[in-house]
């Protein structure tokens, strides 16, 4: 009987967490965290939001915003940006850390940055020449992929 109760409790817990996981819902712009709204208003003031959603995965909340021109931004639960991707243009000035911009301008003249992904341990940028550069949190180049 004890094993049955443990099994039943485990199944119930698994069911609840599975139902809670992957709980995405569309939201309005004003439902984004304040920091996310400020980021969008600062760097993309003339862009029209096509779609915004809140993503809930177990204990983590994140947000995704897509603009009508295919620019996509992902935000952490606190509103800090995690990823910015400009499919048909380059990133606005001020998003990419200056050290990375200087490295790209010095080593890849005439090439622009169209995407940036900020992780816990590194920052990855995608260049218009097809290269992806990965920097540590001190902005030292640690990897390059084509």
Model regions: which residues?
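Bacterial Sec-dependent N-terminal signal peptides
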Residues: 1-24
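Interaction-mediating elements
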Residues: 22-146
């Amino acid at each position: 009987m004890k094993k049955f109760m443990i099994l039943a409790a485990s199944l119930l817990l698994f069911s609840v967490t599975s139902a809670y996981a992957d709980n995405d819902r569309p939201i309005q712009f004003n439902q984004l965290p304040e920091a996310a709204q400020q980021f969008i208003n600062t760097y993309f003031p003339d862009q029209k939001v096509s779609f915004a959603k809140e993503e809930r995965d177990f204990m983590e909340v994140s947000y995704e915003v897509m603009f009508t021109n295919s620019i996509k931004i992902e935000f952490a639960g606190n509103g800090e940006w995690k990823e910015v991707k400009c499919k048909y243009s380059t990133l606005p000035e001020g998003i990419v850390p200056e050290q990375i911009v200087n490295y790209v301008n010095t080593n890849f003249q005439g090439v622009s940055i169209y995407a940036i992904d900020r992780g816990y341990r590194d920052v990855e940028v995608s260049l218009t020449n097809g290269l992806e550069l990965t920097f540590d949190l001190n902005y030292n180049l640690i990897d390059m992929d084509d």
